[in-house]
């Protein structure tokens, strides 16, 4: 079953990105959020703790091969969306970093 609608495909072609709603289950999202907080070793209820290393100004975290990230990258709906975009089933799953951009300090 196709993940991308004709409108999604046209948006991709025009803008170079597309948003896939509900691409992974909510449990997967919660696992990534928990993994990020654990990696940062900060108190998610204490905003003052959010602004110390290892958070860079760009928000990129050197959190590479974490299972929660792999689970999302390999999720069937994500795979199928990339397969439709690139026109092939022969895809390699790669890993990337996570990002944490806390709001500006009050």
What does each model-identified segment do?
Residues 1-15, 21-106:
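Non-heme Fe(II)-dependent double-stranded beta-helix
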